[in-house]
């Protein structure tokens, strides 16, 4: 009669457990390796626009000015799908006043109601509250509302600016001071397509975006449909940016556009 060692089953379990632990450690190491220092991430170059939506997004691309107490925008993801690990929420804006490889602005377009929404979103490696950094990762966005995306004489009818992860302030009365000043043939020309925004931190609230009289800077624009599959997958992963909400992800985009939709006065 064949006998079975009382330890044979245990040995089999231990072997499986060891293999499982090894696989888990490998998986964790891969996940950790996927998040890298902000200065390692290479932003996407701005491609030549080919579609109506892409051309409109370039036409209306805004300037962003950052105050001296917050971070400048960084690239959040590279072509391989690696994401930034952000920076710890401490020591003011140390380590995030200059993006070594250049900054990035992300765009996505959606028709909504009788208007077209162009969302521009920026990533920041620290989140600020009451003037102090409190945690890793922050996203801020604006939605520029266009009356007719396909028309050569299309115009901005409103702009909605993020005041939190999901809420927007909407402005329908824009004046010349809200638009960029561009130098053309030794003359300063006021744009009628490029708005000026400031990433601002003041008072008893989180940092937010507002219209400003400062010119700021342009960033390379990459549209959602121009990203690599790996980059889109990374931006769609809620685990990659802590509690910060990626406003143009597949999960969030439509809800943000709906929230930002302006009042009846401009519909």
From Swiss-Prot:
Entry keyword Secreted: yes
Positions occupied by motif Conserved undecapeptide motif: 117-127
Role noted for this protein: Probable secreted effector that may act as a pathogen-associated molecular pattern (PAMP) recognized by the plant immune system.
Record protein name field: NLP effector protein 6
Domain of life: Eukaryota
One Pfam family linked to the record: NPP1
Family, per entry: Belongs to the Necrosis inducing protein (NPP1) family.
Keywords: Glycoprotein, Secreted, Signal, Virulence
Localization (cell): Secreted
